[in-house]
From Swiss-Prot:
This is 4-hydroxy-tetrahydrodipicolinate reductase. GO terms for molecular function: 4-hydroxy-tetrahydrodipicolinate reductase; NAD binding; NADP binding; oxidoreductase activity, acting on CH or CH2 groups, NAD or NADP as acceptor. InterPro entries: DapB_C (IPR022663), DapB_N (IPR000846), DapB_N_CS (IPR022664), DHDPR_bac (IPR023940), NAD(P)-bd_dom_sf (IPR036291). CDD domains: DHDPR_N. The keyword Cytoplasm applies. Gene3D superfamilies: Dihydrodipicolinate Reductase, domain 2 (3.30.360.10), NAD(P)-binding Rossmann-like Domain (3.40.50.720). It comes from Streptococcus pneumoniae serotype 4 (strain ATCC BAA-334 / TIGR4). GO terms for biological process: diaminopimelate biosynthetic process; lysine biosynthetic process via diaminopimelate. The lineage of its organism: Bacteria, Bacillati, Bacillota, Bacilli, Lactobacillales.
Length: 255
């Protein structure tokens, strides 16, 4: 039996890529799409909804969300309330929101996934960086994205920093008496690690994790050149959350 999928934010670039992926997979069935600004009632024969409230009681298994940080939490909560296992690629969640959604998913006995990055290479980068941070506590992150991305730093950069902080010696990166001649020049501070965000046209999603030690350096980098790189992870997420009974944060928990 096919997994019935709703895609919220289907008009965006990630939403469109997700739609095409679902439409070409015989194990998945795209049953509805959501966008508050869409004027048509159908898209490729699929019903279009402008208000998520109209999807209450709709028959579907999975809610895929590529919307905006402003509505992502509300959408994920709505999905869980209505029996849809959420697969969320929208970033901008606070740690408190993630914890609350995990608890609510357990109460609803529903699986779910919030993933800062669906590219398998990016997930591996985070794992490699976590291993390296045990031995190289001096580290900075540079994340680079297209200039339409609204949140900074990226969810991937934050997740990477969180994972490294679990194993890394907590030290302040840089000189103790350093002075920023322009505010923000040293980037965001996460447990002593610095995170730098680049936003330029032509980019998709890229990240470097740079480690330094006496007389040596180590650089880990991942590049997504096309949004199709995320679809393997989205596909995996859809097929896995229907088997689970709790929401997880990070694709690595489903691998």
């Amino acid at each position: 039996m096919s997994i019935r999928v709703i895609i919220a934010g289907f008009k965006g670039k990630m939403g469109q890529a997700a739609c095409q992926m679902v439409l070409t997979d015989p194990d998945l069935d795209l049953v509805a799409v959501l966008d508050p600004f869409e004027s048509e009632s159908e898209w490729q024969g699929i019903p279009v909804f402008k208000d998520k409230a109209d999807l209450a009681g709709f028959e579907a298994d999975v809610w895929v969300d590529f919307t905006t940080p402003a509505v992502a939490y509300e959408n994920t909560r709505f999905a869980l309330e209505n029996g849809f296992a959420p697969v969320v690629g929208t970033t901008g969640f606070t740690s408190e929101e993630i914890a609350e959604l995990k608890e609510f998913s357990r109460a609803q006995d529903l699986g779910g996934l919030i993933a800062p990055n669906f590219a398998l290479g990016a997930v591996l980068l985070m794992q490699f960086a976590t291993q390296a941070a045990k031995y190289f506590p001096n580290v900075e992150i540079i994340e680079l994205h297209h200039d339409k991305k609204k949140d900074a730093p990226s969810g991937t950069a934050i997740k990477t920093a969180e994972l490294m902080a679990e194993v890394r010696e907590s030290i302040q990166q840089g000189a103790a008496d350093e002075e920023e001649l322009i505010a923000g020049a040293r980037g965001a501070d996460f447990d002593g690690m610095r995170i730098h965000s680049v936003r330029l046209p032509g980019l998709v999603a890229h990240q470097e994790v740079i480690f330094g030690n006496q007389g040596e350096g180590l650089t880990l980098r991942h590049d997504s050149y096309d949004r199709i790189s995320f679809m393997t992870g989205v596909n995996l997420g859809i097929k896995e959350v229907v088997k689970r009974h709790e929401l997880v944060y990070g694709l690595e928990h489903l691998l």
